[in-house]
């Protein structure tokens, strides 16, 4: 068994490696070398993902988390039982949970530390491994939570060009884009089954003979949502939801209860690599990991180290149950 001090030290060192999207190389190298120190072969693939395989008993389980973080450095420090730092919650705490569950368990596991999750998920889209039987993605769900659904993400570009007329005779490109946004947003609603979103970019100016406008929006889409065919789609990742009766979900519920906690099944308004990996391999996928997702991307990102350590034990119990133990 690996000591709690060593697990905390690993996480702190990983968080200390600043790895915003596009700059994951040092963190990937660190994880690879740590696997090798524990006697597990690992490699970095052609897109920068770090992959490790531990052969064991039972179904093949993919444990996938992301190495990259959003930008914004936070001084790394431990205060009592709390570790502060960018990525401590999203998602190096969950990634470290997957790391130690791989090492300490005797399940049949592929570990994947993925790049570009905060971008366009290049790591997940290009992951080349044998088809797993189950997928567990490292994202903050809370020690007693398991995320069974994520909304989709749709990024769209709208462009308007309006021939110049006297300012009193008509609307320009900017006004048309505003009308378009008001039409799209009039039916927004909160919740997992609602559509909502925001304007990511808005640009309008006049050229010699025309008014030009460009608007990029991001929509969070519910299950079953199909965007209009005429839209200029930059990227679309559909919503994903796993059946709560799945053996994977049941293994989490039982393991969390056995740890003395009340299980919570969660559906989130964000999007994660779960949305890509589940459909990519055609198997059940959930997300699990310590941390409060309300702290994601904020200047106050921090993780409770007791919860981190407990999450490792819960995930190891899940892996035992999946192989029939």
Swiss-Prot record:
Cofactor: Zn(2+); Co(2+)
Keyword hit for Hydrolase: yes
Keywords of this entry: Amino-acid biosynthesis, Arginine biosynthesis, Cobalt, Cytoplasm, Hydrolase, Lysine biosynthesis, Metal-binding, Zinc
One of the GO BP terms on file: lysine biosynthetic process via aminoadipic acid
Binding note for cofactor: Binds 2 Zn(2+) or Co(2+) ions per subunit.
A Pfam family that the UniProt record links to this protein: Peptidase_M20
Enzyme class: hydrolase
Gene3D superfamilies cross-referenced by the UniProt entry: Zn peptidases (3.40.630.10)
Protein task: Catalyzes the release of L-lysine from [LysW]-gamma-L-lysine and the release of L-ornithine from [LysW]-L-ornithine.
UniProt cross-references to PANTHER family, sorted A to Z: [LYSW]-LYSINE_[LYSW]-ORNITHINE HYDROLASE, ACETYLORNITHINE DEACETYLASE
Family per similarity comment: Belongs to the peptidase M20A family. LysK subfamily.
Protein name: Putative [LysW]-lysine/[LysW]-ornithine hydrolase
Upper taxonomic lineage: Archaea, Methanobacteriati, Methanobacteriota, Thermococci, Thermococcales
Gene name for this UniProt entry: lysK
